Amino acid sequence: ASGLPLNADVSSKIIKPLFLDVGLMQYVCGINPYDILKHNDLSNVYKGALAEQFVGQELIAAGGSENFKMFYWSRAKKSSSAEIDYLYVKNGKIFPIEVKSGSAGKLKSMHIFLKEHPDISTAYVMSPVSFKEQHVDKLRFLPFYTRFNNKGVKSSFDSY
């Protein structure tokens, strides 16, 4: 993802599959729903796979057209690999989205991506943070469920 259009840098060897529904993903992967209900902190269940699936599913639902495509970024270097979960394109701008199942940590991949793409003004970190939006430099921290709120990710993208 060196710039727009993102299709120019797509590799057919690297894909990131998403199911149509979180429930279908759980079934195919053999995830027992009762195991999920036993946990107080659902965000850490199955190493964040459910959280990433949920956010991806919501982004696809928000795409609103047949031409909407989901992208992600990965860099594979011998000493340092990095990955951004989703790249969302709105009004000719790229918005990187990182999904974290627990605390946001150092966000190494996001910082690498932003350093390589200084023209990007806003990046999103979706995690189990409190409802209040938190802004740190170019990063906006939002809770998973913000997608359903009219002040959430969709309205944030629409404001650009």
Show where each model-derived region lies.
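Accessory nucleic acid-recognition modules appended to NTPase machines
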Residues: 1-83, 88-91
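Arginine/glycine-rich "motif VI" loop of SF2 helicases in the C-terminal RecA-like domain
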Residues: 62-65, 112-121
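Short beta-alpha junction loops
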Residues: 76, 127-132
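Conserved N-terminal glycine/acidic-rich loop preference
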Residues: 84, 90-96, 133-141
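Active-site ExK catalytic segment of metal-dependent nucleases
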Residues: 94-104
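Active-site-adjacent loop/helix micro-motif of nuclease/hydrolase catalytic cores
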Residues: 103-112, 134
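Short, hydrophobic beta-strand segments that form beta-sheet elements in well-ordered domains
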Residues: 121-127
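Domain-level recognition of nuclease-like catalytic cores that cleave nucleotide substrates
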Residues: 130-160
